A protein has these predicted regions:
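Transmembrane alpha-helices of multi-pass inner-membrane enzymes
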Residues: 57, 80-92, 96-120
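Short glycine-rich loop/turn motifs that provide flexible caps or phosphate-binding loops at active sites
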Residues: 3-5, 46-49, 93, 110
């Protein structure tokens, strides 16, 4: 609960007998490699400690970037801010955050968003 099952270990944990639902007929189809939602993935793999650390890191970075954007009106920074915000919306399903192409794009946009903080 506090520390999760470890990065990319969701697929191993979900196959354990203790999570098996005997009322569900096709139990083989319940196995998946990741939770398909970034918040659930962080909670299950890094626990409540890792989740809150991630959220604080992202939102404090967003706060600084928005504050910087309001001073400079840099459109590159704005595009990074918008991408990061839409990527962490809880209503949007996502691929595995730790091992997909989309997570690479997320971190590139995060770097663009934060890269213009030094210019102020």
């Amino acid at each position: 609960f506090y520390f999760g099952v470890g990065l990319k270990n969701y697929r191993n944990e979900v196959r354990k007998k203790k999570y098996e639902n005997t009322e569900y007929i096709d139990t083989k189809k319940r196995f998946t490699t990741h939770p398909h939602q970034v918040h659930y993935e962080f909670l299950s793999e890094t626990g409540i400690t890792g989740y809150f650390t991630f959220i604080i890191f992202i939102f404090s970075s967003l706060f600084l970037a928005i504050k910087s954007y309001l001073k400079t009106n840099n459109l590159y920074q704005l595009s990074g801010i918008i991408f990061v915000l839409t990527s962490i919306l809880p209503i949007i399903p996502s691929g595995s955050f730790f091992s997909t192409y989309s997570s690479s794009i997320f971190w590139i946009n995060f770097a663009i968003m934060c890269g213009y903080l030094r210019k102020n």
